[in-house]
Amino acid sequence: NLYVEGGSEQFRYGFGGSYNKIQGVMKSSIRDIFSGNLDLLYRVGKLTFSNKISVDVTKYTNPVVPFSEYAHANPYYPKRTVDGIVEKWLEYKDNEFSATDASEIVGNPLWNAALSSYDKSKMFGVRNNFNLEYRPFDFLYIRGRFGVAKQTSDSERFTSPEATEFDQVELLKKGSYNDVRRDDFSYDGDLTLTYGQIFNDAHQINAVLGMSISERKSISKGFSAVGFPEGNYTTPGFSNKYPD
């Protein structure tokens, strides 16, 4: 983390940033987080302005093989051959392989993890908050605030056609790609007038008048494709068709 500030009594500024890399429980679960902000404060007479801009960038890399698949692969299954080769299928407890009974087939999670599959996402967000405070008289206080935020996210998941889940799928439908994008936009603000005065050291009058505005919008788009050739052909341009 880093934060630097300076200025004078009338004008203050500060900017900072932070970076954090979080390793998940599973080896391929990684989260990179970057945050930055710029703070400005300006005072002139009875008027005070302040503005804060925040930027957040997050990248996720998720395991392509869920923990449940590793848990399903019982410890007595040999995950590699004596030569250290990772095979596609695990042994059966009776050491008989019968592709005719797909319900008995147990895929090797190490095989699936070594393929060109990926599950990743990224997020970018920016927010600006503006504040105004004005006290023209001792008995009158005016405060205004306005904030606007924009956030975009993109999630991509590709599963290789060589993955065990496609073993019983026809050739032109093996492999899948999914992309989901979302845009969020929002703003909110409020204005408050506060009046308070004492008359004749005995009577007090207080009044508050306020108004607020806000709006939120979200747009989501998705795209899917199936049917990929074997190898490192992981973009939708190599797909065969849209899913049925």
Predicted ranges, named:
Residues 14-16, 50:
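Periplasmic plug
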Residues 12, 127, 139-143:
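A common structural microfeature
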Residues 17-23:
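Transmembrane beta-strand segments that form the barrel wall of outer-membrane beta-barrel proteins
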Residues 6-10, 19, 42-46:
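A generic beta-sheet turn/junction motif
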Residues 1, 24-29, 35-125, 143-244:
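Surface-exposed loop/interface segments of Gram-negative outer-membrane beta-barrel transport/assembly proteins
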Residues 133-138:
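Long hydrophobic segments that form regular secondary structure
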